[in-house]
Amino acid sequence: MENKEAGTPPPIPSREGRLQPTLLLATLSAAFGSAFQYGYNLSVVNTPHKVFKSFYNETYFERHATFMDGKLMLLLWSCTVSMFPLGGLLGSLLVGLLVDSCGRKGTLLINNIFAIIPAILMGVSKVAKAFELIVFSRVVLGVCAGISYSALPMYLGELAPKNLRGMVGTMTEVFVIVGVFLAQIFSLQAILGNPAGWPVLLALTGVPALLQLLTLPFFPESPRYSLIQKGDEATARQALRRLRGHTDMEAELEDMRAEARAERAEGHLSVLHLCALRSLRWQLLSIIVLMAGQQLSGINAINYYADTIYTSAGVEAAHSQYVTVGSGVVNIVMTITSAVLVERLGRRHLLLAGYGICGSACLVLTVVLLFQNRVPELSYLGIICVFAYIAGHSIGPSPVPSVVRTEIFLQSSRRAAFMVDGAVHWLTNFIIGFLFPSIQEAIGAYSFIIFAGICLLTAIYIYVVIPETKGKTFVEINRIFAKRNRVKLPEEKEETIDAGPPTASPAKETSF
C-alpha cells in the first residue's frame, strides 16, 4: 500500500454500480449494431455456399459462354471467405486513430458506413449480375468487424462500473454468437438460403447498422474518454449520472483523475513505444497470448470438422444444418452463462475451466476420429466432443478475453494495445483458415493434438501470469502488473486535472 502524504484525505469509498436502464440500453444498442455484425457476416456464407457458387458460375457463363473450372471456382470462393479476416486486420489498424479522434461512441457510429454500403451492394449483386460486388463487400464488412471488435469492448468497458465490467464486457461475444446463430437460422434452405432469398440474406446486415444509427446517438460517450482524453469533467460527470442513476460518483471520478495524471506523465503511447515499454511488457504479452490462444485452440477446426463428424454418426447431409443450429444454441446458452458467472467466479476461473474442457475434448476427439471406423459407436461420442468443445470455448476463451484486454491497460496505452490485440486476432484467424486444411490433409485427426497442446500452454500462462481482475479499478490492476514488470509507479500527486485534453510528446502521437 502506498504511503499518503500528510494531510491527504482518506480514499473515497466507491458505491457499487447497478445495471441502470441507460447503461443497459446503451450496451444493447452498441453491441447489436457492432458485435452482431461480426458474428452474422462470419457465418452467413457457410451453410448456403453451394447457392453462392452456383450464382458465381451462372454469372461467369453469361459473360464467357463457359463455366468456371474447379480451380477458378476454388480461388473465387476462397477470396469470398478469406477477404473478411483480411478486412478485419485493416480495420484493427484503423481503430486507434478513430477512437481517439472521434471517441468510442463516434467510432461505432461512423463504422456503420462500412456495414450499410456493403449491404446495399450485396443486395443488388444478383440483379447487377456481378459476383465481384460480394467479394468487395466482404472486404468492407471485414473492416467494419475489425473496427467494432476493438472499439466496442473499449466503449463497454469504459461505460460499466467495476462490479459490472465483466458482465457488460462479455456482451461483445454474446452478440457475436447471436449474430452467428441468426445467420445459421436465416441461411437454412427453407428460409433465405436458396436461389431466390440469398440477396436478402446478405442485405440484412444493414438492419443492425441502421438501428444503431437511430439509437446510439441518444446515449452518452465514454466518461473516461471525456475526462481523460478531452479534459471535460463536466461532460464525464453528466454521463456518469445517467449511467449510474445516482450523484455519488466522486470515487469513480477520482479514479479517472488518477488515470489522467498517469496519461499526462506517460503521454499517449504509440504501438512501437508500447512494444518497447518495460512497464507494459506482461500486459502486452498477455493480450497476445489470450487472442492467439482464442483462435489457435481449434475453434475453427472444430467447425470445419463438424459436418464430417455428424455424417459419420448417421446424420443425413440434409439434416446436418439443423445439428449445426443445435450447436449454435449451446454456444449462446454457454456464452450467456459466462456473462452471468464472470462477476461471481472471476475471469481466471472461467478461462482455465474453458481451456481445460476444450483441451480434453480435442484429445478425446482425436481418439474418436482414429477409431470410429473400427468402433462405429464412437461416432456418437464425436458429436458429444464437438458440443463439449463449443460449450468450453463459449464459457471462457471466447467471451472473457474481451473483458480482460480492456481491464489490463490504462487509457494512455489502451488504443495502441487494442491495435496489437486486433491485429493478432485477425492474423491468427486468417492463418488457421489458410493452413488448417493443409495440416488436416497431412496429419488428419492428429491435428487436434496440436490444439490440445495449445489449450494446455495457454491455460498454464493464464494460471501463472494473469491476475484476477474482478472488482478492481483500472489503476489497481495497473499496480498489480507493475509488480510483475518490476517497475515502480510514480507517486500520485494530489492535483486536479487542467481543462483541455492531455498533451503528448510528438514521438508518441502517431498510431504506430
Curated annotation (Swiss-Prot):
Q: Which residues lie on this side of the membrane: Extracellular?
A: 43-78, 129-138, 194-198, 303-321, 372-379, 437-445
Where does the record locate the signal sequence feature?
none
Naturally occurring in which organism (per UniProt):
Homo sapiens (Human)
**This protein is called what?**
Solute carrier family 2, facilitated glucose transporter member 7
Q: Which Pfam families match?
A: Sugar_tr
Compartments reported by the entry = Cell membrane; Apical cell membrane
Tissues showing expression: Expressed in small intestine and colon. Weakly expressed in testis and prostate.
Q: Which family does it belong to?
A: Belongs to the major facilitator superfamily. Sugar transporter (TC 2.A.1.1) family. Glucose transporter subfamily.
Record text on activity regulation: Glucose and fructose transport are inhibited by the flavonoid apigenin.
